[in-house]
Amino acid sequence: AILHGRDVLYVLEQRAPGGPHLVSDVGVRLPATLTATGLALLAALPAEQVRALFPGAGAFVQRDGRGVASGVALRSQLQQVRARGYAVEHGLVTDGLSSIAVPIRDHTDHPLAAVAVTWADRAEDPVVDDAVVDSVQRAAAELTRRVRGRR
């Protein structure tokens, strides 16, 4: 997915056979603040660019009263993403599904896109599997190397 204004735009999807039904598909746009891909991309941007994208409360989209609703809440969430090294979303886009995402960066360290994994997770307090995180981080690192022209 890539950032397109305040939304993420899905440009490539690879689905597991028998996997959960996803609302994301090539060409679909979703609010960046509700998705792991969007949060990963926003966390990799300079703070002033994030402020320009989300200048006030009217810039935020919530789903069923959930999701960030202010610049303060968004900055806090993006700081958590940076500290953790990946973005996570539990049930904001689709109930019962969780996602993690990591940005792909260009030679200037600017985020170009994000790679993510989504899985069915009905737990009250979903746990993110370290092996899944590692796989997504390795995929993003490899794509970053390729974008930067390194083998």
Report residues per predicted region.
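Short hydrophobic alpha-helical segments used for membrane anchoring or interfacial signaling
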Residues: 1-5, 11-14
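A conserved hydrophobic position in a structured secondary element of the catalytic/binding core
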Residues: 3, 45, 119
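Glycine-rich beta-alpha junction loops
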Residues: 6, 15, 58, 95, ...
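Short, solvent-exposed recognition segments
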Residues: 12-93
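Juxtadomain coupling helices with adjacent low-complexity linkers
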Residues: 72, 77-79, 84, 95, ...
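Short hydrophobic beta-strand micro-motif common in sensory/regulatory domains
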Residues: 98-102
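Sensor-regulatory modules in signal-transduction proteins
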Residues: 104-107
